[in-house]
Design a protein with these regions (language model features):
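N-terminal helical cap/lid subdomain that shapes the substrate entry/recognition surface
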Residues: 2-94, 101-102
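Asp-based, Mg2+/Mn2+-dependent phosphohydrolase catalytic module
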Residues: 1-5, 97-100, 104, 113-222
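Glycine/proline-rich, flexible active-site/cofactor-binding loop segments
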Residues: 107
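Conserved phosphate-coupling serine/threonine residues in phosphotransfer and NTP-handling enzymes
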Residues: 14, 110-112
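Conserved phosphate-coordination/catalytic loops
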Residues: 86, 90, 111, 141
Length: 222
């Protein structure tokens, strides 16, 4: 087959502009306990499993043994924000709709947990066949397990799909799964790789033709 069969989307920072929600609630949580959490601290957590983020927050709050409780509270706050309003990244919804109209399959692979995606589900278009969250795997991103699971569910080889990712850990996971990756960096610069193209302008100026052409170039370079 010489046509793109599936798009595998990251969620936070790629499909949905939820990073301001995460960063805002992280800052509020730490401030409520007299600690400090800077933009740089928040950006370092982009793409990490929420458990790792929560442990860093707990330490900033001087509550290093309360990582699980902090994680539960952080997820609850962000889920409420997403449930109230889910802002798509510029160009993302249009790209998803164009892909659906062209019968290109789509799914979501995220480092967020099921509570976040449950809050988002009602606002997602029906184009997405399934969602894989951090709760569905033993080893979250940057481990390739989540992307390997997505490829098995799609029953497609990695070269017939394109992975959209914004973070260092997410793109590393996609590449480790053998995927062809299009990086759309938001807060973290991405390192070049033979199987990754980087759209520094994000998806705002990207249409389906550009994505398919890029996928084909990556595939042909294999």
């Amino acid at each position: 087959m010489d046509s793109l069969q599936a798009i595998i989307w990251d969620f936070d920072g790629t499909l949905v502009n939820s990073e301001p929600y995460w960063h805002g609630e992280e800052k509020r949580l730490v401030a409520e306990h007299g600690g400090s959490w800077t933009d740089e601290d928040a950006f370092r957590m982009v793409g990490q499993h929420v458990r790792i983020t929560a442990q860093h927050l707990a330490e900033a709050m001087r509550r290093p043994d309360d990582g699980d409780a902090v994680m539960t509270e952080l997820i609850s706050r962000v889920a409420r924000r997403i449930s109230d309003r889910m802002p798509y990244m510029p160009g993302a919804l249009e790209l998803a709709e164009a892909a659906a109209a062209s019968d290109i399959r789509q799914c979501i692979v995220t480092a967020s947990n099921k509570d976040i995606l449950q809050a988002a589900k009602a606002q997602l278009p029906p184009a997405f066949e399934f969602i894989i969250t951090a709760d569905d795997v033993t080893h979250p991103k940057p481990n390739p397990e989540a992307y390997e699971l997505a490829l098995r569910r799609l029953d497609l080889p990695a070269t017939q799909c394109v992975i959209l990712e914004d973070s260092i850990s997410g793109s590393a996971a996609g590449l480790a799964a053998g995927g062809l990756v299009v990086g759309v960096p938001m807060h973290q610069p991405l390192e070049p790789h033979p199987r990754m193209a980087i759209f520094d302008d994000g998806l705002a100026t990207t249409n389906l033709d550009r994505l398919v052409d890029t996928w084909r170039q990556l595939k042909d370079a294999e």
